[in-house]
Amino acid sequence: VTRALVNGLPLPSLLVDLLAAHRWCHPGDAILQTVVPWIKDPLVFLPSLKEMAIASQWELFIEDPDFAAFIHYARGAQSVTPMELPWLDVEQAIFILSSQWPGDDQGVALDYRTSRTDPRVLASDWETTHACLWREVTPTFSAFVQQLGL
């Protein structure tokens, strides 16, 4: 069995199945707003492994330490202590939803720090502080899919 990989990370089999069945799609603003209420801007469900890989290219953002701190991006492999929320470990994350409008800098990502097969789901939060923090949406991807009704 060939595993679907994005940036070396295996996509959850449920996501692979949803993509193959063309069921990985936006459930409507009202439903998405109940699952991720702190994101007000429109989001796009990334429709392919290629789009997820493009959205998950962190290199430009992580090279500037001030900007990386502002958006709470870090490389876990370079951290002396375990990296926890509100930080996003860019080496252990894949974007699955992104801003509809460039520059809105909103996103939803799989966070593999908790599981390689059913990672938790995080979303950016620009509402609570002057910087981007990462918050848990659901403890697993399967719970995220269930809440969305996909």
Which residue ranges define each predicted feature?
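A surface-exposed partner-binding patch
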Residues: 1-103
